[in-house]
Amino acid sequence: MTDDRLYFRQLLAGRDIAVGDMMARQMVNFVYLIGDRASGEAVVVDPAYDPQGILDVLAEDDMTLTGALATHYHPDHVGGDMMGFSITGVAELLELTSVPVHVQDDEGHLVTRVTGVTDANLVRHASGDVVRVGAVDIELIHTPGHTPGSQCFFVDNRLVAGDTLFLEGCGRTDLPGGDPRAMYESITQRLARIPDDAILFPGHLYS
């Protein structure tokens, strides 16, 4: 696969999509689009805040959505109620287009509880599974710590890390399901094989 074939976009909620959404501007979540330009297929990582806006970006780029990937179950990444606000996400996305939602197996029940989607909408994965989009392979790496089923995605020497790893630290471990020991293991062991020259793409603009 050549770099010209890989489709990779980083969208900032509150700026690139969900413009004017107060919650999106406060949480500064990143949404990622990954696909194969040759086949025109793409998946979205953490489609919160503005599903229609995400589809509009894909349409402008002549890409078709074929799936969604969740780094973890928190509403600012997959939709649901948070701090008194209702955030749109995978449930609303599935109302617009029928695609599978890829989740880490340990977190499937949490995604259904938070978003209201059914288990039939989910594809549950183990660490090391690969989601293929055209000729683009995305490796799923289970990285518990922020939540029990947090996962990172590795594609073309790029690590889409969700809330596991940021530019200046790791995700919080003091929320329900957080585990500092698991986070330490995820960073020092599970992600240790990621090349030093890999580019990090975190879940929030925190740095």
Regions from the PLM with identified roles:
Residues 63, 117, 137-142, 147-207:
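Metallo-beta-lactamase
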Residues 27, 39, 50-137:
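Active-site HxH/HxHxD metal-binding segment of metal-dependent hydrolases
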Residues 39, 49, 75, 107, ...:
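Short, glycine/acidic-enriched loop or turn micro-motifs at the edges of active sites
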Residues 1-42, 49-61, 91-92:
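Zn-dependent metallo-beta-lactamase
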Residues 34, 71, 143:
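Conserved S/T- and glycine-rich ATP-binding loop of Class I adenylate-forming
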